[in-house]
Regions:
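Active-site machinery of serine-nucleophile hydrolases
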Residues: 55-121
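Alpha/beta-hydrolase fold active-site loops
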Residues: 55-56, 88, 129, 154, ...
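A short loop-to-beta-strand scaffold at the N-terminal edge of the catalytic core in hydrolase folds
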Residues: 36-49, 57
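Short, small-residue-biased leader/transition segments that mark boundaries at the very start
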Residues: 3-4
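C-terminal catalytic histidine-bearing segment of alpha/beta-hydrolase fold enzymes
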Residues: 185, 191-215
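Short beta-strand/loop motif that positions the catalytic acidic residue
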Residues: 177-180
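Primarily recognizes the serine-hydrolase "nucleophile elbow" in alpha/beta-hydrolase
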Residues: 128-172
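Gly/Ser-rich "nucleophile elbow"/oxyanion-hole loop immediately N-terminal to the catalytic nucleophile
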Residues: 49-53, 100-137, 148-152
């Protein structure tokens, strides 16, 4: 019955934890994850007491992009100083590349998947309390990754970024904040943010009406 099913789930999960801990201990000690030819470095700080359900995880993506490595390294270090949550793990990854689109290339998805799984297993993160944020080039990444990886996050916050070619359709069930200054005219970010909100609302209404008519 359900009791045996639950017991089997617990056994399988515990075996999975043991396997991951044996395979990935070094990458957590070194704070770097490599998949293929891309390496994601990261650092994190822990705040507050751990709740019974596990810690919150805040993944905060730095700005920069399209610049020499030392510039993006500086942006990464600066990102570590920006927020201090009352509870949870504040984690800042260092983008694997220094390109303008450093946070929304295809290699980011599997790297973030592995990072989140590692933090759940090694640092007792609650998988239902994983949050994504970023500003400038990091904001670009939030625009892109939140719809693509919406099942991984409890909420996402975009600051001063540009959506580029992304679609908001994956955000229907994901709380999503846009923070762009009224006078932030670089790359037309202020006007594009308004357009993105309007498009999202329009898509939401269409999907809601479709669900009503087909139910």
């Amino acid at each position: 019955g359900d009791v045996y099913k639950r017991q089997a789930q617990i056994i399988i999960w515990q075996e999975h934890i043991s396997l991951i801990k044996s395979q990935r201990l070094n990458e957590m000690k070194e704070k770097r994850i490599t998949i293929g030819d891309k390496t994601l470095k990261f650092d994190f700080l822990i705040y507050g007491e751990k709740p019974k359900s596990g810690r919150s995880l805040y993944i905060s993506m730095h700005g920069g992009g399209g610049a020499p490595p030392q510039v993006n390294d500086g942006q990464w270090k600066n990102q570590m100083r920006l927020y201090k949550p009352n509870e949870g793990i504040y984690l800042c990854p260092r983008a694997p590349t220094d390109t303008w689109n450093l946070w929304h290339q295809s290699h980011i998805d599997p790297l973030f998947d592995r990072l989140i799984e590692n933090m759940i297993i090694f640092e007792e993160v609650d998988p239902d309390k994983v949050y994504l944020m970023g500003y400038s080039a990091g904001g670009d990444g939030v625009y892109q990754l939140a719809p693509r990886m919406c099942d991984r996050f409890a909420a996402a916050a975009m600051m001063a970024g540009h959506p580029n070619e992304t679609s908001p359709q994956g955000l229907r069930n994901l709380p999503f904040a846009l923070q762009v200054g009224e006078n932030d005219k670089s790359y037309r970010r202020n006007k594009i943010a308004l357009s993105c909100v309007a498009r999202s609302l329009q898509n939401f209404r269409k999907m809601t009406l479709k669900a009503i008519h087909t139910s």
